[in-house]
From Swiss-Prot:
Protein name, entry field: Heterodimeric geranylgeranyl pyrophosphate synthase small subunit, chloroplastic
Function: Heterodimeric geranyl(geranyl)-diphosphate (GPP) synthase small subunit. The small subunit alone is inactive in vitro while the large subunit GGPPS1 catalyzes mainly the production of geranygeranyl-diphosphate in vitro. Upon association of the two subunits, the product profile changes and the production of gerany-diphosphate is strongly increased.
Chief localization: plastid
Places the protein is found: Plastid, Chloroplast thylakoid membrane
Coiled-coil portions: 274-301
Cofactor binding, note field: Binds 2 Mg(2+) ions per subunit.
Cellular component per GO, a single term: chloroplast
Organism, scientific name: Arabidopsis thaliana
Name of the encoding gene: GGR
Family annotation (Pfam families): polyprenyl_synt (PF00348)
Positions with a binding annotation for Mg(2+) 2: D127, D133
Source taxon at top rank: Eukaryota
Length: 326
């Protein structure tokens, strides 16, 4: 459930620097080190336009993908979560950015990008249910089950999962994406949401047991980031080795954002500093892991504007109002 913490408005992404490598560092010397200083990209790359344009396109395509049909109630519940204001759109943006890294066509990536957001929304609907995490609020607004009831929320989530697969098959341009690639995309998403992915993480989160915290973080939060990056790589024509680098990158980013959210929440609750220090160290380690994988592409292809959006996922986490030890 990648980036499933508090809502972040589009303006927050717009506040990212247009030239990442010239980002002025306003944090204290003990602050988390940003990858911006080493991020590739030309002086002319307009990051703000990239993010706003891409998110606007994704929102439009998601709106078109889920029209209200009969019975209207279930479609309204589906749209409530998928089109929610404040949604970060991290999975679809990461997918498109990874596709474009390898020269892929954005038009080829949009159907899968939208499918990833549908799956992400479905997982959050189910996550918030009283029988799961019992969260009455999502992104500052009532959760799906709070508005529509638990029964309808379950149905809305159940409907979004197959709709995601259907959308990939019916909307992916056959002249841009081979059938074999479509099959791999579906397999990747199915693995992510199933008993070896997010479902496993949610199970352990519910039941506990002899599992390390990293297992829950990897399965429940890292899996969606991993899937988003890999799907983009598949659409862009990445090699198997490159897909593995994307897999490690996405997993690290997904886990990083959750750790950051946990740190922020702990600061609000004034927990003891010992646990917080451990989480800060974990966040720094995850950040470095994500950067390491991107540097593989930087070294291989000589950097360039196409890497900047993927670096910003790491940089944005690094500047979310918390400090890490050097």
């Amino acid at each position: 459930m990648l980036f499933s913490g508090s809502a972040i408005p589009l303006s927050s992404f717009c506040s990212l620097p247009e030239k990442p490598h010239t980002l002025p560092m306003k944090l204290s010397p003990a602050a988390i080190r940003s990858s911006s200083s080493s991020a590739p990209g030309s002086l002319n790359f307009d990051l703000r336009t990239y993010w706003t344009t891409l998110i606007t396109e994704i929102n439009q395509k998601l709106d078109e993908a889920i029209p209200v049909k009969h019975p209207a109630g279930i479609y309204e519940a589906m749209r409530y979560s998928v089109l929610a204001q404040g949604a970060k759109r991290a999975p679809p943006v990461m997918c498109v950015a990874a596709c474009e890294l390898f020269g892929g066509d954005r038009l080829a990536a949009f159907p899968t990008a939208c499918a990833l957001e549908m799956v992400h929304a479905a997982s959050l609907i189910h996550d918030d249910l009283p029988c799961m995490d019992d969260d009455p609020v999502r992104r500052g607004k009532p959760s799906n089950h709070t508005v529509y009831g638990s029964g309808m929320a379950i149905l809305a989530g159940d409907a979004l999962f197959p709709l995601a697969f259907q959308h990939i098959v019916s909307h992916t341009p056959p002249d841009l994406v081979p059938r074999a690639t479509i099959l791999r995309l579906i397999t990747e998403i199915a693995r992510t949401v199933g008993s070896t992915g997010m479902a496993a993480g949610q199970y352990v989160d519910l039941e506990g047991g002899p599992f390390p915290l990293s297992f829950v973080q990897e399965k429940k939060f890292g899996a969606m980031g991993e899937c988003s990056a890999v799907c983009g790589g598949l659409l862009g024509g990445a090699t198997e080795d490159e897909l593995q680098s994307l897999r490690r990158y996405g997993r690290a980013v997904g886990m990083l954002y959750q750790v950051v959210d946990d740190i922020t929440e702990d600061k609000k609750k004034s927990y003891d500093g010992g646990a917080e220090k451990g989480m800060m160290e974990m966040a720094e380690e995850l950040k470095e892991k994500a950067k390491k994988e991107l540097q593989v592409f930087d070294n291989k292809y000589g950097g360039g504007d196409t890497l900047v959006p993927l670096y910003t996922f790491v940089d944005y986490a690094a500047h979310r109002h918390f400090l890490l030890p050097l």
